[in-house]
Amino acid sequence: MAPVKKPAAKGGKKKKQVLKFTLDCTHPVEDGIMDAANFEQFLQERIKVNGKAGNLGGGVVTIERSKSKITVTSEVPFSKRYLKYLTKKYLKKNNLRDWLRVVANSKESYELRYFQINQDEEEEEEED
């Protein structure tokens, strides 16, 4: 028996999928160890669309900054993991990787947090 082909729906356009990711840099920006505008510029230069960095696909990917939050909006498939990769690359470039980490605080956002160094362990060692 021959496989039955389903007729393709003609004229049916796909709904544009808009992806929106936020990066919350509140803590390091308030402490003055990081500049949100500099980070935004870094993302604009480094995000690749169709294998090309810097052009953001002619408006397909947009980056907006409001105080210390950066929002990346994309109309093409865009990975949240790629945003984390670029953030870590920025932190390494600015020698902040030893103090800050990138943590997902929701399905569509990342947050820069300080490493929590356990001070309780140090106190226990001093007591012994």
Curated annotation (Swiss-Prot):
GO CC term, one of those recorded: cytoplasm
For this protein, what is any one GO molecular function term?
structural constituent of ribosome
Q: Keywords of this protein's UniProt record, alphabetized?
A: Cytoplasm, Ribonucleoprotein, Ribosomal protein
One of its GO biological process terms is: cytoplasmic translation
Report the main location listed first in the record: cytoplasm
Give the location in the cell.
Cytoplasm
UniProt cross-references to InterPro entries, sorted A to Z: Ribosomal_eL22, Ribosomal_eL22_sf
Pfam families, per database record? Ribosomal_L22e
Q: How does it assemble?
A: Component of the large ribosomal subunit.
Into which family does the record put it?
Answer: Belongs to the eukaryotic ribosomal protein eL22 family.
Main function: Component of the large ribosomal subunit. The ribosome is a large ribonucleoprotein complex responsible for the synthesis of proteins in the cell.
Q: Identify this protein by name.
A: Large ribosomal subunit protein eL22
